[in-house]
C-alpha cells in the first residue's frame, strides 16, 4: 500500500499505471526547520502563517515553513548535510555472534526493528528479500520536504510501483545492506539478517532525518519490538557541543531507540580553526578555498562560533595569491544578534577593474538560545574569474580575519562539502574537531572507521577481479572524523570496520550509471568506504544485543560499548580512534552478564527431565521453578539455572 500524506492542503491521485500528484500551480514551496516553541500562542501564529508542523518532542518542533519570495541567486542558509562485510565480520571474531559461538546460540536481530534515515533505497534488491521472495523492509517512508509531501509505503506491491526515492543515489541501499541485508546467497551478508527493516528517505534535511527517526520508532511501537536506528549522514557546521536543536531532539528520541550516527569522513581535511585570543595573538585569519582546489567558484557556508554571547569582530578581505598580500579590505563588522548584511558584486565592477569577485555573500549574526554562544555565518555564491598567471587556480581569494579580547575564543567551521579553510598569516586550519555536528549529542553513538580491506572485488569484462584499495587492514584511517568537544567528551564513541565494505548497490542507480564499476553477482554490489559503512555495522550488532536482552536502554548500550571497546591495536593514541575499537562479541557477553565468566555449562542436556530447577534471567529475576522438562516451553536465550546447590548458565535452543 502507498500512502501519500500532503502535510497541508494538497491533493493526490493514485492510479494503477503510476502515481500522479495534483498540486495547485500556486502551491507554496517549503523550507524545513527545527524550532523551539514557547507557548500556545506561538503555535497558533505559525499555523495561521501556513507553517506545517510534522512532529514534536517537548517544545521542539519539526516544521515546514513556506518560502518567502527571494532572489534566485540568494545563497541558502540551510545546513549542508551529506551521506557520509564478508571480511568486516572477521574482526574480533564478530561472526561468532551469528554462528552461535559467542553465546551458545546465534543472534541475528530476530525480534528487533532496525531502521535507516538516508537517501537512495532499492527496497526490492535481493539482499532484502526473505526465503519467500518478500521484502524484509516492512515500511518505506519518503519525505519531499520542499514540496510538503510525506509518502508511506507498506509492502512489495507498493515498492514495485514506487521503485526508489532517487535513481541517482544508492547510499541508503548500501548502508541498509550492511545493517541487515541477507546477502542473497553471496558472501556479502549484513549483520542483523533476521531483523525487521524500516527505511526512511528524504532530501537529508535535519527535519527529514528526524521525522524518519519518529517513523521508525512508531513502527517499532506498533509491533512491540525494540529499535536500533542508523543515520549515516553528517554536517560540518554547527556548535559541535551537543546543544543544537537536532542533537537535543535526537537525545530525546534515544528514550525509544538506540541511535548510531557516522562520525564523518573529514578526519584529514582542514575545515576547522580553534583559536584563543591573547595579547600576542589578538586575531586569527584564514582564506576560503573550495573543494575543487581552484577557488574559481566559491559556494557554501562558514560559521565562526564565539565561546560566549559577545560577538567577535570580523574583517572581510580579498587576498591576491600572486602577490601574496591583501588586495582589498571590504570592512570590519561586529554582527549583533539578528544583524544581517548582504554584499553583491556584479560583472560590470569586475570588467572595470573595480573589484575582482562576481556574485553574492550574506553575513549574519546570532546568539544561540540553546547555548548562549554568538556565531557569525557567511553564506556565499561568487566567482573569482581571473586566473593566477600560468596556474590552474584563481588569483583572488576571499579572506577573513576574526578578532576578540584576550581570553575569548573562536571556533571556525567550514561546511566541508563545498568549502575548506586555507591558512593565512600563520594560522593553521586542522581536522582536530572534524566530528560531524549531528553526532555530538550525549545519548547517541558516534561511529568512526578503521581499515579492513586491502583488496576489493569488482566485475571487469565479465570476470571478477580484485582491485587494490588505499587502506591497510586493521589500521587507523586518517579520513575518519574525530574531536574532543568543549565539555571534554572524546569522539567518536567507537570505531568499526568501514574501509571498505562490500554491500548492496541500487539497481536503479546501476542502470543510470552503467559505465561505473561494480560487482555483478546477478544483482549489483559495491565496495564502498566511509564512516557511513562503519555506522550500520555497529548498529547491526547492537540489534543482536537487543535480541539477546530486549530491555537494554540507550544508556546501557553506551556503557557496554565504553566498557568493552578495544585499545590493543596499533596507534591506539591516534585521536582518529576516539574511545576505542568496537568489539561486538565482548559487548554481547557483557549485555548477557557474562563479565568474563567462561566456566558455565552451555547445554541443557546436563539436566535430567525431573530435576528440580530454578531459572533466573541474566538480570537476576526468577522466572521459573519446577521440573527441568518444563524448560522446553521457554523462549530461546541465556539463563542462570539453579540445580540443587549448583548454579550453571544454560543456553536454551
Spans of model-derived segments:
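Active-site core segment of subtilase-fold serine proteases
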Residues: 121-173, 177, 190, 322-416, ...
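C-terminal outer-membrane/trafficking sorting elements
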Residues: 596-653
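Secreted peptidase-domain scaffold signal
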Residues: 254, 269-312, 318, 584-595
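C-terminal subdomain of the subtilisin-like protease fold in secreted/lumenal serine endopeptidases
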Residues: 222-235, 239-244, 256-263, 269-272, ...
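Catalytic-core environment of secreted peptidases
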Residues: 144-160, 317-321, 347, 361-362, ...
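Subtilisin-like serine protease catalytic core
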Residues: 102-209, 224, 254-256, 270-271, ...
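Hydrolase catalytic cores
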Residues: 176-179, 184, 198-209, 214-223, ...
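Autoinhibitory propeptides
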Residues: 38-113, 123-134, 437, 454
